[in-house]
Amino acid sequence: MSKNPLYTNEIATAHQFVIAHNTDIKLQNFLHDMRFRKDLMHSDRWSLCYDFLKENYPAATDSIVTGLAYYLED
């Protein structure tokens, strides 16, 4: 997980979201693909997470998006 202490709650929320949806193949494939995208800046990673979550999980909050973007950076 990201070492940024400012986003600890967001990262924890995103982690719980991932656990709650652990059987969703689309989410698992997205997470797998994003893990290998080391070329992305945080803002690009955030945008990709936002687009994916809003398309597949319209109720996902910006807190989940932010947490997921930081969660995937490490």
What residue spans do the PLM features occupy?
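Short intrinsically disordered terminal tails
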Residues: 1-6, 70-74
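N-terminal acidic leader/helix
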Residues: 2-30
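Acidic, low-complexity, intrinsically disordered interaction modules
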Residues: 20-73
